[in-house]
């Protein structure tokens, strides 16, 4: 597979996912970029904005296994990872694997689980491995977490610590669809038959595991010349000296942004990254990795606004 064929494959995958998820083209793109980059996504949005449908549709189009965990305050690490259960027939312990042993894991309302459970998922995200009763178990190379949180209800939640937020390649903000898209969705849901059909929406599995590995090999070969790497570093360093930011982005953030730029370039059929790639991915890659200063918060500024100001201020290579 060459870059042209890969670009066409990704365009077809976008189309398949779009059969079920309408009006979220930019979000679909960023989820696919994260998946091919080997990262994870944190999705923030109100209930009823197709977050679960998005995860299920991506898994269907990519022919990957899918599991969902509803995070609650009483969820324990064993409920996520799995437990060793004693078998009285052979007097041995046997591992009962938890839902983390999958390809695409939807961690629904992740901020409702206590920190102990969140940290168990953190190891899986970071190392693609889990430890159960002192024994390490590997997860698949395609393991991908799409975690959601509700920005409206914050009572009884456990905010994700900075270390865990930093493990997400992107933080995506999902909003309600526009008027025309909402009408189209309601039209599609007009009958019960169409509602049941929406569960799979006729999505064809287009990407085999071999094709996924082949695509990642193409991405690894994408060139980022010194001017692009310097531009990424300058943008990240600018977050550390901005008056509106209390804590700026880390070196890991720069590395994550560079990885995402390579994927976006490959999606466009290019073997090189452009400043446009960096600018398009800057906000979703960094909005969860900076902490605004108290004065900026009092003035009503948002991470997105501050990052856009930095993007406008730092000169892009020509």
Regions found by a protein language model. Give the residues of each.
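Pre-Walker A (pre-P-loop) alpha-helix and adjacent loop at the N terminus of AAA/AAA+ ATPase modules
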Residues: 3-46
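Conserved AAA+ ATPase core "coupling" helix
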Residues: 77, 81, 157-222, 230, ...
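AAA+/SF3 P-loop NTPase mechanochemical coupling elements
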Residues: 94-103, 132-149, 160-169, 173, ...
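Conserved AAA+/SF3 P-loop NTPase catalytic/coupling segment centered on the Walker-B
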Residues: 99-126, 155-165, 176-185
């Amino acid at each position: 597979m060459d870059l042209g064929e890969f670009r066409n494959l990704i365009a077809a995958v976008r189309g398949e996912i779009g059969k079920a998820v309408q009006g979220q083209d930019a979000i679909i793109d960023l989820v696919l970029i994260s998946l091919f980059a080997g990262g994870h996504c944190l999705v923030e949005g109100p209930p009823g904005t197709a977050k679960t449908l998005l995860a299920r549709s991506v898994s269907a189009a990519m022919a990957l296994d899918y599991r969902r965990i509803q995070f609650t305050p009483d969820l324990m690490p064993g409920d996520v990872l799995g437990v060793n259960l004693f078998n009285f027939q052979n007097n041995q312990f046997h591992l009962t694997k938890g839902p983390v042993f999958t390809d695409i894991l939807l961690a629904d309302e992740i901020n409702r689980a206590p920190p102990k459970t969140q940290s168990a998922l953190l190891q899986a995200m970071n190392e693609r491995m889990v430890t159960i009763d002192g024994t390490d178990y590997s997860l698949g190379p395609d393991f991908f977490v799409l975690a959601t949180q509700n920005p409206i209800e914050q009572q009884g939640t456990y905010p994700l610590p900075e270390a865990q937020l930093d493990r997400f390649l992107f933080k995506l903000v999902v909003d309600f669809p526009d008027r025309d898209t909402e009408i189209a969705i309601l039209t599609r849901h007009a009958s019960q038959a169409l509602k049941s059909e929406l569960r799979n929406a006729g999505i064809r599995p287009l990407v085999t595991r071999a094709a996924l590995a082949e695509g990642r090999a193409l991405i690894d070969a994408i060139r980022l010349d010194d001017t692009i790497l310097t531009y990424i570093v300058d943008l990240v360093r600018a977050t550390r000296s901005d008056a509106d930011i209390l804590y700026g982005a880390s070196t890991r953030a720069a590395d994550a942004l560079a990885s995402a730029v390579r994927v976006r370039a490959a999606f466009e059929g290019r073997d090189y990254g452009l400043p446009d790639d960096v600018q398009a991915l800057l906000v979703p890659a960094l909005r969860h990795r900076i902490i605004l200063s108290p004065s900026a918060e009092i003035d009503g500024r948002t991470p997105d606004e501050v990052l856009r100001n930095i993007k406008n201020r730092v000169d892009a290579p020509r």
